[in-house]
Amino acid sequence: MTNQTTSIPLHDRIRLIRIQAFFRSATGNPFSLVLGGGLSALALTSVGVPSYPLRVWFALILLLSGLIFAFERFVKRRGLTQENAGSLFRRRVALGLVNAALFGGVIGLVPEGTAQTAYLLVFVVVSAVAALGYMSYATEFRYGLAVSVLTIAPYALFCFYRYFAQGDAFLLLTGIIALVWQAVVVSKALHVSRSAV
């Protein structure tokens, strides 16, 4: 161990290790999100959601995922050091949260009168994105929690809004299930995160 390494406080070294683990875990996620977004757009179109807004939504997912991929390659080339890790981590988190918000916002594209299947499809999508946030980034629980809030909360709130507007008990039940499911996932993710670095 060098003098330079030993001069770094322990909590700073642990923070660097956690950020390095975060970036390692992120490898491949942009492709997963593009694939998931594309399949979601096709599935939602098939159950009556208008195709044009879904194409725009998917184009934004594609663009942002491309930016994340390019940024991660930049970080890999540059390397993570004690000096740059914090700022690079914050930029990557910002990009990831914008992408999560896009996935969370897809529920707003479901028009009134659409088949209940559309709501279930969106639930599968946002749950998968939230789970990906927790599983891939166990060393950064707060990031996973933010992804969850940006994906599941809009979905549940939209279902509750539609329930009060339309009186469809299915939407009330779906919103409740989304919140209960996330409470279960959050508790498990917190346990895993505490056992990480």
What are these regions (language model features)?
Residues 1-22:
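Short, Lys/Arg-rich, polar N-terminal cytosolic tail immediately upstream
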Residues 23-79, 175, 179-180, 184:
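Hydrophobic alpha-helical transmembrane segments of multi-pass membrane proteins
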Residues 95-187:
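Hydrophobic transmembrane alpha-helices
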Residues 194-197:
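Cytosolic signal-transmission helices at domain junctions
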